[in-house]
From Swiss-Prot:
It comes from the Bacteria. It comes from Proteus mirabilis (strain HI4320). The chain crosses the membrane at residues 4-24, 34-54, 158-178, 192-212. The lineage of its organism: Bacteria, Pseudomonadati, Pseudomonadota, Gammaproteobacteria, Enterobacterales. Keywords: Cell inner membrane, Cell membrane, Hydrolase, Membrane, Metal-binding, Metalloprotease, Protease, Stress response, Transmembrane, Transmembrane helix, Zinc. One of its GO terms (molecular function) is zinc ion binding. Belongs to the peptidase M48B family. It holds the Pfam family Peptidase_M48. This is Protease HtpX. It is found in: Cell inner membrane. GO terms for cellular component: plasma membrane. One of its GO terms (biological process) is proteolysis. InterPro entries: HtpX_protease, Pept_M48_protease_HtpX, Peptidase_M48. The active site is at 140. It is an enzyme of class 3 (hydrolase).
């Protein structure tokens, strides 16, 4: 709760400063205030709705089945492993699901630490040893224990808010600059220019802003790897990452990649990857950089 309050206060403070600066430049105060409210509602609203629906959407997108009553030795082992690790980190046991996919992968999601979901692919259970699978599960449990889902949502909300706010402000300047006298009576100038410029800028700034969220996602992956190493041992986590190097390209939806153990490696720039390269993750574990 404190984390949410700090993020919201920081966002409001920065937006307040922006409002003062823009008011000094001559933009109508009511226009700025309304835009700040609208940007905040849309920016945070979309992020939080996605978070609240994350378990349902994740299960639906991969066709996952929550294990209610285990029917096999593998399912019993999976539940026992998640239960034991949850107790170790002090969280309520997440729901556990299995989904049919050939790639070696797993993910965690949920709106709260004590109302989360951990899902693993059939490819992971078939291809990994128990030690390797245990390390992957510990990685996902670490995501839950660290509150990474909520933190990523808050960061996305802040980023969304600023993308909307700054895009609309610049669009307002441009529209007013090229508008006729009659159109200038409208606080946003020419409405077609305003909407066109704001849409283009939101796309451009959205792409640039994703660099921030992807950097944070990569940073949290190192910490989740370290959390797994603390739970089950460094060598098990290294072995799991080495196994991932031989796996299929992940098939999960892009929106879920941030909390999968295995991310996509095909990108024209590492800046837009949700996961660090596997070799860097292995090296970080060996050096103990995030284990301190």
């Amino acid at each position: 709760m404190m984390r949410i309050a700090l993020f919201l206060l920081t966002n409001l403070a920065v937006m307040f400063v922006f409002g003062i600066i823009l008011s000094l430049t001559g933009i109508q105060g009511r226009s700025v205030q309304g835009l700040m409210i609208m940007a905040g509602l849309f920016g945070f609203g979309g992020a939080f709705v996605s978070l609240l629906m994350s378990k349902w959407m994740a299960l639906r997108s991969v066709g996952g089945q929550v294990i209610e009553n285990p029917t096999s030795e593998v399912e019993r082992w999976l539940l026992d492993t998640v239960r034991r690790q949850s107790e170790q980190v002090g969280i309520k046991m997440p729901q556990v699901a299995i989904y049919d996919a050939p790639d070696i992968n797993a993910f965690a999601t949920g709106a709260r630490r004590d109302a989360s979901l951990v899902a693993v692919s059939t490819g992971l259970l078939a291809s990994m040893s128990r030690d390797e699978a245990e390390a992957v599960i510990a990685h996902e449990i670490s995501h839950v224990a660290n509150g990474d889902m909520v933190t990523m949502t808050l960061l996305q909300g802040v980023v969304n808010t600023f993308v909307i706010f700054i895009s609309r402000i610049i669009a307002q300047f441009v529209a007013n600059f090229i508008s006729s006298d009659e159109e200038s009576e409208n606080s946003n100038g020419n409405p077609w220019v305003y909407m066109g410029v704001s849409m283009v800028l939101e796309i451009v700034f959205g792409i640039l802003a994703s660099i921030i969220t992807m950097w944070f996602s990569r940073y949290r992956e190192f910490h989740a790897d370290a959390g797994s190493a603390k739970l089950v041992g460094r060598e098990k986590m290294i072995a799991a990452l080495q196994r991932l190097k031989t796996s299929y390209e992940p098939q999960e939806e892009s929106s879920m990649m941030a909390f999968c153990i295995n991310g996509r490696n095909k990108s024209f720039s590492e800046l837009f990857l949700s996961h660090p390269p596997l070799d860097k993750r292995i090296e970080a574990l060996r050096s103990g950089e995030y284990l301190k």
